[in-house]
């Protein structure tokens, strides 16, 4: 794996961000619950054999692997080496060859116009500087190429979960915009307005039948999801705060859990680089 070292300007926030995503086991969440989202974005983006594809904030490979299976030449990049190693293992098990790059979405180590398609599923939304991230995705995409993202909506379960834990997360940079804004049609379109044409958006939902009760759902995120673990660690010395956050997440899970099934809403954004 080629390792990219961020500049000193970005080192501190990038390091903190990387450490948060290494908490728990996000790869397990991605593979157990979120895996269907990758093929959806690959199909929506019209990825074809021979396309040069960059998966930004690739995590454990939910987009990279199906794109490679479609015959694309794929480079998977992520800030967290632990997740990239998991993706490498999955790709190797499937007999696929991909390029791997440890990289910050806000400062991608690639040339302008290097890729035919730049994709991200539940990834770039977590980079603290949204406009800089969008500018980078556009920069490395060739003219006429496709930029596609899939992100949680503010109104859906996952968006509300992120809003619930956000006040308890100490590692968020001051003034950082909310990650769920990437799931708003107007907001994400505005981020790319100077770079793209043929903007299209559509909403969908991921069906999740993993949890038997609200408490099980809460504990799953509490034990495996890095941002939630980060939030709980920040209030570990306050039983009252822990109880409050427990109750808030439990109630949210109860709201969306119906006969053992949940629907998690997402937004797909696609556009052509000008």
From Swiss-Prot:
Residues 1-30 form the signal peptide. Keywords: Signal. CDD domains: AdoMet_MTases (cd02440). Gene3D superfamilies: Vaccinia Virus protein VP39 (3.40.50.150). The keyword Signal applies. SUPFAM superfamilies: S-adenosyl-L-methionine-dependent methyltransferases. One of its GO terms (molecular function) is methyltransferase activity. To M.tuberculosis Rv1405c. This is Uncharacterized protein Mb1438c. It comes from Mycobacterium bovis (strain ATCC BAA-935 / AF2122/97). The lineage of its organism: Bacteria, Bacillati, Actinomycetota, Actinomycetes, Mycobacteriales.
């Amino acid at each position: 794996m080629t390792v990219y070292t961020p500049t000193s300007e970005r080192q501190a926030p990038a390091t903190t961000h990387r450490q948060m995503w290494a908490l728990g086991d996000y790869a397990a969440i991605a593979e157990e619950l979120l895996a269907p989202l990758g093929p959806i974005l690959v199909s929506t983006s019209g990825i074809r054999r021979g396309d040069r594809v960059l998966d930004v904030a690739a995590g454990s490979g939910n987009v990279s692997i199906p794109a490679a299976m479609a015959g694309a030449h794929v480079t998977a990049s992520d800030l967290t080496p632990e997740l990239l190693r998991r993706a490498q293992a999955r790709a190797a098990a499937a007999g696929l060859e991909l390029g791997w790059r440890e990289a910050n979405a806000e400062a991608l180590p690639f040339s302008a116009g290097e890729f035919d398609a730049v994709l991200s599923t539940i990834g770039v939304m977590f980079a603290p500087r949204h406009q800089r991230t969008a500018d980078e995705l556009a920069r490395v995409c060739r003219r006429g190429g496709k930029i596609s993202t899939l992100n949680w909506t503010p109104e859906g379960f996952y968006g509300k979960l992120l809003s619930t834990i956000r006040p308890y997360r100490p590692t968020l940079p001051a003034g950082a915009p909310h990650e769920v804004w990437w799931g708003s049609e107007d907001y994400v379109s505005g981020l790319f307005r100077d770079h793209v044409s043929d903007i299209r958006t559509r909403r969908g939902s991921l069906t999740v039948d993993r949890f038997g009760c609200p408490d099980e759902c809460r504990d799953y995120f509490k034990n495996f999801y890095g941002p939630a673990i980060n939030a709980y660690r920040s209030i570990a010395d306050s039983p009252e705060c822990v109880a409050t956050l427990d109750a808030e997440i439990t109630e949210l899970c109860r709201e969306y859990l119906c006969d053992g099934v949940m629907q998690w809403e997402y937004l797909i954004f696609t556009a052509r680089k000008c």
